[in-house]
């Protein structure tokens, strides 16, 4: 086992504080509408330029191991805030730095660290309650656009795109961000259910100009098995041909003789057919087939429940207004499924989301809800260079998380104003002893830090503006972008309540642990022993 280096008391805390300050100083220059960029060197390719706090934090590793421990703990604050709300990473870092700096001053002055931490925790619990009272629901698309704009660093086009996407696919809809091909940002909305499986044979194509298959008012056969024998399909094909409608077959696979016969029938114009593989694998495939059945009022033909493909009738088939299939995707538009049944299915999947343990499962279930409930929107980010593209894509993703958080828990006045108002509301809070009271004051003072940092980044005098804002009431604050005072909510400067709450809770949690640190242990650097010179050979 390697030898260890151990530091105690003030020596340890000073080193840790240096690390906290180095990381936080690098992150906090990005805060607010006039925050600056940080350039991150990459071992290959062009450097990354970012205004995203957590991206900056993740890059920082310090040479001194004790300082690095402090930096890594603050990095944890930014990561946790990012995981919980998807934004507010810089605010969380600024709050943590303020609490640690003020708290360690109090420890150096002889206060009991454990009571300080208890005081800080009391203040945060009270502050979160007050934040909830200040919160306003975020329901209309104007407010959603404003939240998106603020989170994307005052980029209005991004805010509008996100609001438009949410309007089209609903609050539950899946919105994804992709790299576009042009200079302009674009929004693609896919209404209906889309899944990532294309046609099984290019001979099904009936729209050569777009390379796609389009079926109008088709019947949809859903089979949870491989189909290789055409005999199994004949009864259904004959019934569909009599009805004079096209047919879409969604099965685990269609191969061999069955696929060849379908292709020949299609090319001769006897019956219009297209076949695709069912989406997903294993149990997820069964569930997604059931989703399609719910959407199209069909039945999944599965041998598990004793149904045979040869005995399927038109009543077992689903129907939709239109189906579009290209090389990689299938879209089912306007299934004839009953709205109440679809909502029941959605509620069932939501229950599974609540119980899901892994993020991956949760994400997949969320996608299924979106496909049943609304649709899928894709925001394609446009930029002139790859460096700009990466930076912009990260901002748009942040803005998307922020708007989701706003819809979930509502919004409060932005620009650091909400925390100032909360601090004044709980100014009379008292702890069980004097040291806890100092802890409460540490937390209250730290709540001013985000506003001060926004003002400093805008090149103004922090104390003057902080005092003016404190003298005001409600959502009165300072707009650093236009350099004027006024009603923050009226000016559209909003922060999601969830983002502000998460930032405060995670900052206080980690900062409280750092204040109560008394000893730090790390590995001693290994000394490289000089290689022995090779012995001379006798001649």
From Swiss-Prot:
ATP binds at residues 30-33, 51, 87-91, 415, 495. It catalyses: ATP + H2O + a folded polypeptide = ADP + phosphate + an unfolded polypeptide. The keyword Chaperone applies. It is found in: Cytoplasm. Keywords: ATP-binding, Chaperone, Cytoplasm, Isomerase, Nucleotide-binding. One of its GO terms (molecular function) is ATP binding. It comes from the Bacteria. It is an enzyme of class 5 (isomerase). GO terms for cellular component: cytoplasm. Transmembrane segments: none annotated. InterPro entries: Chaperonin_Cpn60_CS, Cpn60/GroEL, Cpn60/GroEL/TCP-1, GroEL-like_apical_dom_sf, GROEL-like_equatorial_sf, TCP-1-like_intermed_sf. Coiled coil: none annotated. GO terms for biological process: protein refolding. Its EC number is 5.6.1.7. It holds the Pfam family Cpn60_TCP1. PROSITE patterns: CHAPERONINS_CPN60. The keyword Transcription regulation does not apply. Forms a cylinder of 14 subunits composed of two heptameric rings stacked back-to-back. Interacts with the co-chaperonin GroES. Belongs to the chaperonin (HSP60) family. Together with its co-chaperonin GroES, plays an essential role in assisting protein folding. The GroEL-GroES system forms a nano-cage that allows encapsulation of the non-native substrate proteins and provides a physical environment optimized to promote and accelerate protein folding. NCBIfam families: GroEL, PRK00013.1, PRK12849.1, PRK12850.1, PRK12851.1. This is Chaperonin GroEL. It comes from Serratia rubidaea (Serratia marinorubra). The gene is groEL.
């Amino acid at each position: 086992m390697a030898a260890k280096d151990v530091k105690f008391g003030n020596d340890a805390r000073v080193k840790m504080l240096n690390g906290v300050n180095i990381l936080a100083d690098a992150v906090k220059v990005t805060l607010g509408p006039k925050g600056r960029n940080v350039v991150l060197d990459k071992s290959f390719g062009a450097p990354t330029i970012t205004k995203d706090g957590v991206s900056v934090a993740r890059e920082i590793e310090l040479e001194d191991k004790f300082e690095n421990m402090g930096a890594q703990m603050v990095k944890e604050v930014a990561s946790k805030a990012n995981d919980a709300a998807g934004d507010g990473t810089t605010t969380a870092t600024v709050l943590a730095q303020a609490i640690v700096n003020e708290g360690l001053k109090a420890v150096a002055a002889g206060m009991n660290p454990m009571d300080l931490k208890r005081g800080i925790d009391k203040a945060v619990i009270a502050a979160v309650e007050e934040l909830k009272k200040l919160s306003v629901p975020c329901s209309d698309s104007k407010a959603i656009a404003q939240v998106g704009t603020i989170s994307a660093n005052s980029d209005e086009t991004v805010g509008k795109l996100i609001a438009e996407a949410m309007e089209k696919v609903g609050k539950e809809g899946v919105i994804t961000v992709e790299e576009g091909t042009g200079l302009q940002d674009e929004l693609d909305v896919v209404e209906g259910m889309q899944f990532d499986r294309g046609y099984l044979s290019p001979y099904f194509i009936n729209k050569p100009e777009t390379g796609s298959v389009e079926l109008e008012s088709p019947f949809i056969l859903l089979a949870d098995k491989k189909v290789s024998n055409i005999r199994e399909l004949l009864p259904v094909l004959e019934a569909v041909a009599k009805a004079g409608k096209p047919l879409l077959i969604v099965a685990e696979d269609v191969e061999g003789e069955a696929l060849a016969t379908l292709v020949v029938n299609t090319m001769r114009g006897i019956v219009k057919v297209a076949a695709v593989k069912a989406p997903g694998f294993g149990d997820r495939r069964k569930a997604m087939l059931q989703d399609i059945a719910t959407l199209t009022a069909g039945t999944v033909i599965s041998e598990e429940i004793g149904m045979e493909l040869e005995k399927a009738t038109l009543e077992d088939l689903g129907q939709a207004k239109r189906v579009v299939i290209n090389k990689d995707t299938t879209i089912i538009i306007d299934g004839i499924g009953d709205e109440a049944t679809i909502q029941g299915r959605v509620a069932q999947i939501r229950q599974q989301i609540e119980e899901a343990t892994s993020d991956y499962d949760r994400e997949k279930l969320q996608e299924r809800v979106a496909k049943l409930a609304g649709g899928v929107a894709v925001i394609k980010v446009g930029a002139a260079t790859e460096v700009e593209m990466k930076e912009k894509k990260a901002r748009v993703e942040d803005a998307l998380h922020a708007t989701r958080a706003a819809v979930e828990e509502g919004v409060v006045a932005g620009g650091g104003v909400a925390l100032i108002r909360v601090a004044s509301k709980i100014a009379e809070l008292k702890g069980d002893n004097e040291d806890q009271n100092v802890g409460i004051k540490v937390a209250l003072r730290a709540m001013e830090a985000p506003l001060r940092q926004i003002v400093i980044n805008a090149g103004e005098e922090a104390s003057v503006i902080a005092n003016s804002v404190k003298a005001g009431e409600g959502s009165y604050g300072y707009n650093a972008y236009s350099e004027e005072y006024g009603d923050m909510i009226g000016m559209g400067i909003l922060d999601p309540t969830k983002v502000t709450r998460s930032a405060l809770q995670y900052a206080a949690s980690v900062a409280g642990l750092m204040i109560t640190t008394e000893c730090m242990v790390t590995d001693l650097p290994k000394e490289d022993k000089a290689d022995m010179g090779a012995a001379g050979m006798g001649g």
